Amino acid sequence: MRKSTFSLVRRSSFVLLLLLCLYRLEGHAFERNLWDDGWRFAICQDDSPQQSVFDDSAWRLLDLPHDWAIEEDFHALHPSGANGGALPGGKGWYRKHLVLQDKDASSRYALHFDGAYMNTSVYVNSQLVGTRPYGFISFSFDLTPYLNKQGDNVIAVKVDNSQQPNSRWYTGCGIYRHVYLMKSTDVRIAQWGVQAITEVKKGVGNVMLNTQIENLSGRNRRLIVRQKVWNKNHEVVAQGSKAINVVAPATMVSQQMRVQKPKLWSLSSPYLYTVTTEVLENNRVIDCDTFNLGLHTVKFDVQKGFFLNGENIKINGVCLHGDLGCLGAAINEDALHRQVKMMMEMGVNAIRCSHNPPAPELLNLCDSLGVLVVDESFDSWLQGKTPYDYSLYFKSWFERDLRDMVLRDRNHPSIILWSIGNEVLEQWNKVNNSGMALEDVNILLNNTRDKSALSQGDTLNLNSKLTQALAAIVRRYDPTRMITAGCNEVSPNNNLFKSGALDVIGFNYHQKKVKDVPQNFPGKPFLMTETVSALQTRGYYKMPSDSLFRMPGKKRPFTDPTFLCSSYDNSCAYWGSTHEQTWDVVKHTPYCAGQFIWTGFDYIGEPTPFNFPARSSYFGIVDLAGFPKDCYYMYQSEWTDKPVLHLFPHWNWIEGQTIDLWCYYNQADEVELFINGKSQGVRQKRNDHEYHVAWRVTFEPGEARVVARKNGKVVGEQARKTAGTPHHIRLTPNRQVLKANGRSLSFVSVEVVDKDGNLCPWAENNIHFSLSGDAKIAGVDNGSPFSLERFQANERRAFFGKCLVVVQAGKKPSNIQLTAKGVDLAPQTINIKSE
């Protein structure tokens, strides 16, 4: 009984401290309140909404995160173009009231944005507080000097995404990540002010905690900083306390702790400790902070690639853009979790955040699920790729933005590399690329070299020096991790490589040059930071399958009127390769640490190889709606221990037509194909460089079946049957119990099937959805890259037999019913509960 009571007290103490630090509960000197709900919103091209007296009563009332562009129609004339998703930009305004009854003169308030795209300006009581251009960075503004601490305050936020195009892909528009209202005293832990530097050695986890305390009070303060490391059983496994004299404007305090016999963070067991920091004055807690801590060892080796905790692991990664399909850019934890879990089930163990700092929720997920991360800063530096991109702001903001990315993210154990850029144009040896005067260059780089030294033959020209400057910023705030960049110029003459600032050589594509890496980059670890760029449309197959269909060059537009790309692994962009070709190189190159495939999911924008009406990508292993393409199963057969037997394509063709059937498999010696019971032959992967088997057969209605055998025994079977006339709708939710929090989602797969339940692979029926209960339809999709149907709707046309509807729970517990109907189709209703 005493042990049980002690455990209860220990758990209660931990939970109370965690709540105090994590949420900074209301009523304390320090508060951290989620401030998403109850904003007024409108598209407005002038600046009148900045005025406190502006009447916003007719504006729409909504909750954040919010992406206004995803709610609109696609159009060829939107200035973002097809690469930007053919959706509009504009200026959006958000307004909200903050009523204070604060008699404490030392209280300070800040508004924190996890992300808003882009050019965000914040006004308080008609006064401009500040502006932040970069649409992917987290930032805060101190509201204190502008507030009425007794009474009403008007917060107005302008998000200006009117200058288009400013990106090579769809970014969304608006305050698309979470917002927090922060309250503190005039002595506090700096934002992102606790840094953990860890080392695991001889069975001990050494943890150095560096904590920056800000002092805005105008006098020295005597404080105690108390820090603890907790395990998952709510036990303190390391702790320290230090009394310090905090002077203005800030003081750094360091404490060394030791975790005995630590449990290591790994892919299979991502163990997380919790670090709490309390700042006390006169025995009263005046501020606190908490974060998760993972203890591990990370190593990039020149000859053997990547090691985690001493284990040699191939990085099986994907690149992901930030949009969530039909939900747009507005962050949602359930949607993110679905994406990451689908990738993990395929065998993915790493994500490259392309090409910008991600939402904090993605990093939290990767920490908790055991997924490695390459955290990337910029897609452009001084040289722009679109007329209004980040290059316009780089000179003024790169140091602040890069610093803030590293400060925000450096305690995440999932992050194994920082990337300071993707395919930046500064790779090439063109000194005048910057368009900057020499005096500006000197200011930018703190470089006093004369103009004659900046010759084209100089190995330390502006672009190399800029690379060094960026890397130096990263190392200043995180000396523990290596630095890379995604480079599509793979010769040693690349200015980024010549700088010597990159710890890991990163190639984007150019798999044929991988063999030259040891000679060209001696002593440097190597990673394929971006690969493949295969082009596929789920459900479409172009034959013969042994012909490779490459996208023509830039000057020869791809004009296939179908706007479809083959889902055999036989279609790719001219700069890329097929999935099997690239994986074969990565798999059989020991010094290659791994790869990041472009991309895990299709994304809105960049519809290579087509233009409008195509408006989303063809690169993904999973389509925009979240339906896997066939190559998903090739990776699953190679990257996981799951038994895989995947026969494709479907079995609905013209009688007598010649059809190529492929099969991905593992854990078997051979696979035999039967058409209506008649053997079409046994196939085997003849060596370790083959990843599928295939048959060329004549179609006849009925059934195509594969039988897998190992040691002569049947270990698996799969059949594709000829579907009849579309008969009814089948609904399959990924979750049937939701949280009644206004954000919880169920992704419901919708299939058109025949009377026997076989998918009708050519079905294009329009499906209408209706809901009862406290819920709404958050979005609809079908995976088509060229459909111009709105994402925000209550109907969707099937695409190769499938579509998707996303149900979002309201804020009241409810029994939700979703009904799907279509002409000449039997409807279906499913029940979803929110509680």
Question: For each predicted feature, which ranges?
Answer:
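Non-catalytic, glycine-rich low-complexity segments
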Residues: 30-46, 58-101, 112-116, 154-221, ...
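Accessory beta-strand-rich segments of carbohydrate-active enzymes
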Residues: 33-35, 42-45, 84, 89-191, ...
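Short flexible loop/turn segments that cap and initiate beta-strands
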Residues: 52-55, 221-226, 239, 268-274, ...
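Short, hydrophobic beta-strand segments
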Residues: 143-145, 255-264, 693-699, 792-811
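Extended acidic/polar, glycine-enriched regions
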Residues: 148, 210-301, 695-701, 710, ...
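Beta-strand-rich structural segments
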Residues: 209-213, 228, 278, 661-665, ...
